[in-house]
Amino acid sequence: MSKFVVGLTGGIGSGKTTVANLFAEEGICLVDADVVAREVVAPGTHGLNAIISHFGTEMLTASGELDRAKLRQRVFNDEQERQWLNQLLHPMIRQEMLLQVEKATSDYVIMVVPLLFENGLDRLVHRTLVVDISPELQISRTVQRDNVDATQVNNIINSQCSRSEKLARADDIIDNHGEISRLKREVHALHQRYLQLSGNHNAHD
């Protein structure tokens, strides 16, 4: 991969989107795994057609789009079906993300991936950046934002890579316990560092 890529990750409610948007304000292109995951199953795509032929048309909404909630429910307790779905979608998502990286026009690219380490996508990046907050804050922020109960959020946290493992595997860490002004300063400092690293990377490419 010719572009210098930073993999941005963090647990649910950690503030990944806020941090990603601050990098975008610095003029950096974002490749977001969640956005790509929706694009590969948009109406008319091979991804959606494969899901319909496997699970049936009941997986569609009235407007012909994928009913994500219904699909999630369908595969949640069925390991075999979940594996089938992952084997279909993960390579598509990965390929589309790499295409978007190559098309990016900024000096480096931020790849926003919630499950960067869990899905082995850290192998696609040159540097990893973890947005870190305490589990207590993760729960309170997500409950407020998504209007879900704390038990649900806790289950999601427990299904993801542990906080200590994420921090141990991170090249860079942003502590998101403070004010937005502090966050902006941290992002700006990292941006300068990544410009330097991408310059060295591009010079030796």
Swiss-Prot record:
Subcellular location: Cytoplasm
Pfam families linked to this entry: CoaE
Chief subcellular location: cytoplasm
Enzymatic class: transferase
Positions of ATP binding: 13-18
Matches recorded under InterPro entries: Depp_CoAkinase, P-loop_NTPase
Gene3D superfamilies found in the cross-reference section: P-loop containing nucleotide triphosphate hydrolases
Residue ranges constituting the DPCK domain according to the UniProt record: 5-201
Catalysed reactions listed for this entry: 3'-dephospho-CoA + ATP = ADP + CoA + H(+)
Pathway field: Cofactor biosynthesis; coenzyme A biosynthesis; CoA from (R)-pantothenate: step 5/5
A GO MF term: dephospho-CoA kinase activity
EC number: 2.7.1.24
Keywords: ATP-binding, Coenzyme A biosynthesis, Cytoplasm, Kinase, Nucleotide-binding, Transferase
Cellular-component GO terms for this entry: cytoplasm
Single Gene Ontology BP annotation: coenzyme A biosynthetic process
Function: Catalyzes the phosphorylation of the 3'-hydroxyl group of dephosphocoenzyme A to form coenzyme A.
Protein family per UniProt: Belongs to the CoaE family.
HAMAP family in the record: Dephospho_CoA_kinase
Protein name: Dephospho-CoA kinase
Organism: Shewanella oneidensis (strain ATCC 700550 / JCM 31522 / CIP 106686 / LMG 19005 / NCIMB 14063 / MR-1)
Gene: coaE
